[in-house]
A protein has these predicted regions:
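N-terminal regions that are enriched for targeting/export leaders
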Residues: 2-58
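Bimodal feature
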Residues: 2-22, 72-75, 88, 405-406, ...
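Active-site nucleophile-adjacent alpha helix/oxyanion-hole segment immediately C-terminal to the catalytic cysteine
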Residues: 44-314, 391-394, 401, 409
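Catalytic nucleophile-His microenvironment captured as a short glycine-rich beta-strand/loop
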Residues: 69, 148, 355-388
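Long, positively charged binding patches that form subdomain-scale interaction surfaces
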Residues: 287-362
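Conserved catalytic-core surface of thiol
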Residues: 373-443
Length: 443
């Protein structure tokens, strides 16, 4: 093993001092910060907010200090349809409602996984994986589908935000504290030879405590409610005693089984045109497992464009923090110039970044437009974010096509856009990925 001796370090000093451009960059960075100093003018010139296909200008939502982007993105796709179908000025579905039931279901999911792994040592990788994060705010498309199909949706006015839904750190801290304690209770009970009936009774007692905790933090979700609205023609409408499930059927009405998750993961362990699932990834026990079809990036973008051309927005997952400017909303591979300013070249490709833990899906948003050239090839993409209207262009972001290539990992599209061969591959027995695989990352 090689140590760092002082002679070597002195050479580094000398090399730095012999490079005036680095010293100029030092002066700029020390006063303005790293990214602000390296931001390029060209990225703003290349990525204006004009698109040949532009589906919506509806006001954006705001997930605030929570990790609910996957829910917001899904509910936003429904919201645009609902606003159009029912002639509304603006409208939001309750993200807190979906949040409550996700926490409830994830708690049960975690306890079931603890029971299933009770024969493993406490230090085993799978048990440690479970205990490291019993639950969190993030999720996947198939997980939110499971929630909508079981619990429906409600208007935001019926089940509004609470402090704990908008800023979820404390809720997560103490829910995970409770779940780790519950895990010990169940493992100790099983170690003593308890019957499955005894374990189930204990688990139900623990779930009552969890339910109480969630209700105190978020409020009790309504079992039925009244809904009234006035449309753009000033016509008054009213529904009484409607359930969340009935509200979904009437006001959203999408058949969610018609949609599939498509990924682009160009690593050698994931051949294209095959389906994948992830071990230990889920929320609703008994719901279909998370499933993806892996395709090449050109095909990935063709599918997204096909759905946008059909007038429907696209839920997608990406690594949003890479080469992006939160304030301007520009996501482009030339947003920052590390080469000219520092002499550093980031040259890992997409597969390398996945393999070496440099990148994974971190955030879900909605594609609501695309700018196509004369040959129908994408130049840039319109993105609806859920960070409020004080960033980007009133909350909308723009992604260059090269940024999409490098940092986008998942889209959700209708099955009708797949070829018969692709649909058969999606429906085939999926390869099971390890729980810690980057494709198991939650948006």
């Amino acid at each position: 093993m090689s140590t760092l001796d002082f002679d070597f370090t002195e050479r580094l000093y000398a090399n730095y001092l012999a490079n005036p451009s680095l010293q100029a960059t030092e002066n700029t960075v020390s006063h303005n910060g790293l990214l602000k100093s390296l931001e390029t003018r060209q990225s703003a010139i290349d990525n204006d907010y004009v698109f040949s296909i532009d589906l919506t200008k509806d006001a954006v939502s705001n997930q605030k200090a929570s990790g609910r982007c996957w829910m917001f993105a899904a509910l936003n796709t429904f919201r645009h349809k609902l606003i159009s179908d029912f002639k509304l000025e603006n409208f939001e579905l309750s993200q807190a409602h979906t949040f409550f039931w996700d926490k409830y279901e994830k708690s049960n999911w975690f306890l079931e996984q603890i029971i299933a792994t009770a024969d493993q040592e406490i230090g085993s990788r799978k048990v440690k994986f479970l205990l490291d994060t019993p639950q969190q705010d993030g999720g996947q498309w198939d997980m939110v589908v499971a929630l909508f199909e079981k619990y429906g949706v409600v208007p935001k006015s019926v089940y509004p935000e609470s402090i704990s839904s908008s800023a979820s750190r404390e809720l997560n801290q103490y829910l995970n504290k409770l779940l780790r304690q519950d895990a010990q209770i169940l493992r100790d009970l099983l170690a003593k030879g308890a019957s499955s009936e005894e374990v189930q009774v204990q688990k139900e007692n623990l779930l009552q405590e969890i339910f109480n905790f969630l209700a105190v933090n978020l409020g009790l979700p309504p079992r039925s409610f009244d809904f009234a609205y006035r449309d753009k023609d000033n016509v008054y409408h009213r529904d009484t005693n409607v359930t969340p499930q009935a509200f979904y059927e009437k006001y959203v009405g999408l058949k969610l089984s018609d949609y599939v998750s498509i990924i682009n993961a160009p690593t050698t362990d994931k051949p294209y045109n095959k389906s994948y699932t992830v071990e230990l990834l889920g929320n609703v026990v008994g719901a279909p497992a998370v499933r993806y079809l892996n395709v090449e990036m050109n095909r990935f973008k063709e599918l997204a464009i096909a759905q946008l051309k059909a007038g429907e927005s696209v839920w997608f997952g990406s690594d949003v923090g890479q080469s992006s400017n939160r304030q301007t909303g520009i996501m482009a591979t030339n947003t920052y110039d590390f080469s000219s300013g520092l002499g550093i070249h980031f040259h890992q490709d997409k597969a390398g970044r996945l393999d070496y833990s440099e990148s994974l899906m971190t955030h879900a948003m909605v594609l609501t437009g695309v700018d196509l050239d004369d040959n129908e090839q994408p130049l840039k993409w319109k993105v609806e974010n859920s960070w409020g209207d004080k960033v980007g262009d009133k909350g909308y972001f723009v992604a260059s096509d090269s940024w999409m290539d490098e940092y986008t990992y998942q889209i959700v599209v209708r099955k009708e856009f797949l070829t018969p061969e692709e649909l058969a591959a999606y429906q085939a027995q999926p390869q099971i990925l390890a729980p810690w695989d980057p494709m198991g990352a939650l948006a």
